[in-house]
Amino acid sequence: MKFLRNLILSFVFAGAMSLTTSANAACKVHLGDFDWDSANIHTAIAGYILEKGYGCEVESTKGSTTPIMAALFDQQIDIVTEVWRDNLVQLIEDNLAKGTIIELGVNTPSSTQGFYVDKPTAAKYGLKHVDDMKNADIAKLFADPEAPGKGRMTSCISGWTCYTINLVKHKVYGLDEFYTNFDPGSGGALDAAIAGAFKKGKPVFSYYWTPTGLMGKVDLVKLEEPKYDQACWDEMTKVVEDIKANGPDVYKDTCACEYVNMSLTKAASTKFASVASNKPILDFIRAYSIPTPDVNKSLAFYMDESGGDMEETAKHFLANTGIWKKWVPADVAAKVVASL
């Protein structure tokens, strides 16, 4: 996509970057994007097909989870192509009940997230479970230079729901006595912290997830947590949403458990979905689904071969796989192929 503008939409929500593509405006679509690579890839692929295949004017607004999802619920964004639904279950269910969004099926069939330690450190000290981390001598291995006497677990970005989930987990598991729940500031900084520690041979204690390109380059061991339980998760997410709305002082005792392996989903605003002429777009997004191994390949291409160019990554995917042609009519596919 040829991006014509790059600006901060302060009048929509602070800190979000909006990019608009040049097209014939046969339709207009506003995509919500996030500040991590897998979401960026899906937005780039979907946006390229919408522009080149459907002739749409595509606007993409990028930001953290909270403002982007709020904009979707508020009908300011039309479509989000990667939703970590189980991290947002209360918000999603509430907005489905309110009629502000519709769900459009599965994007990526399998994803994981959790707390990880580098394999050499895990093997040397027998670190298998989060309870194994509750030791002052172990915490010293991951010393936080900004919090003397505590270790550091590099966590999510504060604008991501998982940051607050991890905050609650730290309290429930008793990790907060030994570690800070450190906000690295951006997805790129999180990756850099892990990759940099590996390069220097330093211990790593971090939240992380798949699909990502980095996972194929570093050797991380996922720590065991209490087994996933739906009732426990639902109870915990109520506390999480209360903290997100009112601050950490409203924390109350709850249970906690591991993140469930989940399918990532897609959603659209009901305002966009209610327009009859948008049906072909919704049909395309419903059909859009990429197997996890293919997402990992695209992430690796983005990191290693694209020069950090997400459009080139989208074009590489479209030029080298055929699965996307099943998502769209033949004439749309032909236009996309001709543009590559």
Residue spans of the language-model regions?
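Short, well-ordered beta-strand elements
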Residues: 26-38, 56-61, 150-154, 285
